């Protein structure tokens, strides 16, 4: 009789341990070990930490030539050092396609081109409707360039992501797969709600 009681108690203890041990192990791994430390997360781009406040730069709309603000929307930014060559046109096209691929969320994303010269952009108005740009004619141009120059990881060939509050937060290398950028923006928009 005593062995039956002992056996049933051991079974009960075994069942309890099956549920308690995984909880204790996960608690230990999360709070007291280096488990997953240094994990880059699920983002495809490089997270800029700490974020860089860009303020509220006034930018021009490519088609209407009106001054607008980029705040309130996620913004994909890239630099054009000289004239807009084939690489520049490919980047304009790629960013337009990224925005369109977001479907119903495309209105939450803007595209910003930062040009180092005073180029006439009128030839691109039909192909890249809604594109924004900032160049030396803009009053906020020098301040924006200074903030980027202060960033140690500046890569003029990369694409950058600015959050709706005006903080530079992510960087995508020139040869990055646009699908990764789309996934990141979808996740950010979803988590913003």
Residue ranges with predicted function:
Residues 155-193:
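Thiol-/selenol-based redox modules, centered on thioredoxin-like
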Residues 1-9:
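Short, Lys/Arg-rich N-terminal segment immediately upstream of the first membrane anchor
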Residues 10-30:
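Hydrophobic membrane-insertion alpha-helices, especially the h-region
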Residues 96-97, 101, 147-148, 187-193:
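Short, surface-exposed patches at the edges or C-terminal ends of soluble domains, predominantly
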Residues 92-113:
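Conserved helix-turn-beta segment immediately C-terminal to the redox Cys motif
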Residues 21-24, 32-68, 90:
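N-terminal "domain-start" segment that seeds a small globular fold
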Residues 110-116, 120-157, 162:
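Short, internal strand/loop/helix patches
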Residues 68-96:
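Short active-site neighborhood of thiol/selenol oxidoreductases, capturing the structured segment around
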């Amino acid at each position: 009789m005593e062995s039956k009681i002992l056996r049933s108690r051991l079974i009960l203890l075994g069942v309890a341990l099956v549920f308690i041990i995984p909880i204790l192990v996960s608690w230990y791994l999360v709070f007291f070990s280096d488990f997953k430390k240094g994990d880059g997360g699920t983002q495809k781009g490089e997270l800029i930490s700490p974020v860089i406040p860009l303020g509220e730069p006034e930018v021009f709309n490519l088609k209407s030539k009106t001054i607008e603000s980029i705040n309130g929307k996620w913004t994909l930014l890239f630099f054009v050092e000289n004239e807009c060559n084939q690489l520049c046109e490919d980047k304009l096209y790629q960013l337009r396609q990224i925005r369109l691929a977001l479907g119903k969320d495309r209105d939450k994303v803007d595209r910003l081109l930062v040009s180092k010269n005073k180029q006439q952009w009128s030839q691109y108005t039909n192909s890249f409707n809604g594109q924004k740009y900032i160049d030396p004619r803009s009053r906020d141009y020098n301040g924006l360039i200074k903030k980027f120059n202060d960033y140690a990881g500046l890569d003029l060939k990369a694409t950058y992501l600015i959050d709706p509050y005006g903080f530079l937060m992510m960087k995508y290398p020139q040869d990055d797969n646009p699908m990764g950028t789309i996934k990141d923006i979808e996740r950010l928009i979803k988590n913003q709600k």
